[in-house]
Every structure is written in C-alpha cells, then in structure tokens.
Amino acid sequence: MSTWYEQAIFYHMYPLGITGAPKTNVQTEVTDRFKELDQWIPHIRSLGCNAIYIGPLFESSSHGYDTRDYKLVDRRLGTNNDFCEFTKLCHENGIKVVVDGVFNHTGREFFAFKDIQEKKWDSPYKDWYKGVNFGWQSPLGDPFGYEAWQGHFELPCLNLYNQQVKDYLFDVIRFWVD
C-alpha cells in the first residue's frame, strides 16, 4: 500500500509572487491575500493536481526564505487563521496542502540571530547558528562571522546538530500540524 504523496500530483504555489505582494515586508497591517489564492483552486483541480506545495509562508523580511517568525504567516499574505481557511477550502476540494518549511536557515531578523547581534558571546543562542566566530566580522558588519546559505549572509545557517535548535523546529512543526 502506497502513501498518499506517492500518488499525489503537486502544484507548486509561491504565494508572495502569485498575489503580487510587496517585495519587502515593511507594512504593519495584515493584508489577506489568501482570498486571491482561492480562485486558483478550480484551475489546480482542472490540471489533475490533488496537492499543493505552498510557500514560503512564514513571516519574513523580503522573498520569504528569510524567516523572522516561524509561527506567524507573513503579514503580506494574511493571518494564521486566513491560511487555515485556505487549507480547509483546499481539503474540501480534495487537495492536500504541504508547506515549504525553510528550516536550514533564518533571516537576520529572527529572534535568535538578533539576540546574538545584541549580546554577542553572552547570547544563549550563539550555538544556534553554524560557524559563529567572534574573532571575525561578517560581510554585513556583524561583530562576528557565521556560515550563510550559499554565501548569502542575509540567510544565516542554523546549526541543525544543536539539540535546542532541533527541539525548537519540532515545536514549530507541531504548532502547524495541530
């Protein structure tokens, strides 16, 4: 017996792009753009797709892959409840939803990285990131160096060998599954 995803036909949806959301997240108000995604459901069904791979969704500063809060939907897209309503509508139409969770790096505005910027070696999060070195300055002017995703220093790499990081990320996953 195969699992559902082995038979699934996925439609990839990049919500920030498909809805024309602003490129940078400087707004304070929430804009419900999930309603714009609702209209894509008949099209996705007409293609024979029965699953959507959507994301990134988490609160970020720009393109979505620079997460600043894993437990909030990006305010340029709506609220957590708006996303739940979109997911419910997908399920009512026989479409499963899989979220693109960006769990190997964060943005520079993520709470743990900001804490390191502020407290440096006294930060309890200094081991949450790969290659943190207080004897080196980052190309972006931080008083410490760190490993960055593909050399993009606005995307500091999480230390996935750190148990606290793993616990935190599993907590995030449980938050969204519940």
Predicted regions and their residues:
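Substrate-binding/active-site clefts of carbohydrate-active enzymes
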Residues: T3-A8, Y14-N50, L57-D178
